[in-house]
Amino acid sequence: MDGDNQSENSQFLLLGISESPEQQQILFWMFLSMYLVTVLGNVLIILAISSDSRLHTPMYFFLANLSFTDLFFVTNTIPKMLVNFQSQNKAISYAECLTQLYFLVSLVTLDNLILAVMAYDRYVAICCPLHYVTAMSPGLCVLLLSLCWGLSVLYGLLLTLLMNRVTFCGPREIHYLFCEMYVLLRLACSNTHIIHTVLVATGCFIFLTPLGFMTTSYVHIVRTILQIPSASKKYKTFSTCASHLGVVSLFYGTLAMVYLQPLHTYSMKDSVATVMYAVVTPMMNPFIYSLRNKDMHGVLGRVLGRPFQRPK
């Protein structure tokens, strides 16, 4: 196959992480189950928030958008993955691969930025409660979300355009679940120094800056909570941000396992970590946010038409 990766006929072979038919069947049913659970969980969160005026607050506004992002995120990768598990033809066109990569980068970035905005929301609610209504006005919430979307779209476009300049040659076999940046760069036969430098530099800004902001927010939140004299009030206050803290830990923990390493050390063992951030995290987010949320339990009960009992 020649090195002209701009050809409309260019293709990759998306081989997945196993070529065993038996293992592929197991993986098919596993990922199908996880996909259905993810879709159901995030759709229920969106329906619950949109159907009850008591949940029309900044925190739930951002949570609904996080659920929408997670829903879009898994739909970008898993359906193609399921088709490949059941098909002998593993080919994915170059254009389709780049499209998948674009949405993957954009949606991961959007997830990251929304989590940072949610941390700011919790900071204002706990550290500056008297100013919460004015500080988190509907106009500001829409503006913050628009900035998140804009930065995510531009960042995904930047990396995708840079990837479009990379030349591939030899066997274009992707032993992975989807078209992922590091995996594609390992297949390149042209110099990838520039794109790798841009990837590291922009990645540090796009991901570490929000992480630093969230860390600073939680330092102030913890300090404020420690000043509360009542133990029960401390617990109640902390519980309002515990779910967000759990999601942030899961999101950044799995991303760090995959991306905080040199390109030349990237290997198939990182597939497990990739599955964690690409599939497990979007699946777990609705459960984490609704597990101990009494308001969410009541609304979900009405949406489902039956009582929604919190697990003992």
UniProtKB/Swiss-Prot annotation:
Report the glycosylation sites: 5
Topological domains on the Extracellular side lie at: 1-25, 80-100, 159-196, 261-271
Kindly list the GO molecular function terms attached to this UniProt entry.
G protein-coupled receptor activity; olfactory receptor activity
GO terms under cellular component: plasma membrane
Q: Which cysteines are joined by disulfide bonds?
A: 97-189
Enumerate the subcellular locations listed in this protein's record, separating them with semicolons. Answer: Cell membrane
Q: Does the keyword Transmembrane apply?
A: yes
InterPro entries reported in the protein's UniProt record: GPCR_Rhodpsn (IPR000276), GPCR_Rhodpsn_7TM (IPR017452), Olfact_rcpt (IPR000725)
For the keyword Cell membrane, the answer is: yes
Q: Which CDD domains does this one have?
A: 7tmA_OR1_7-like
What top-level branch of life does the organism fall under?
A: Eukaryota
* TM ranges: 26-49, 58-79, 101-120, 141-158, 197-220, 238-260, 272-291
Q: Give residue spans on the Cytoplasmic membrane side.
A: 50-57, 121-140, 221-237, 292-312
Topology in the membrane?
Answer: Multi-pass membrane protein
What GO biological process, any one, is recorded here? signal transduction
Q: List the Pfam families.
A: 7tm_4
**What UniProt keywords are attached to this protein's entry?**
Cell membrane, Disulfide bond, G-protein coupled receptor, Glycoprotein, Membrane, Olfaction, Receptor, Sensory transduction, Transducer, Transmembrane, Transmembrane helix
**In UniProt terms, what function does this protein have?**
Odorant receptor.
The record's family statement is: Belongs to the G-protein coupled receptor 1 family.
What is the recorded name of this protein? Olfactory receptor 1D5
Which gene is annotated as encoding this protein in its UniProt record?
OR1D5
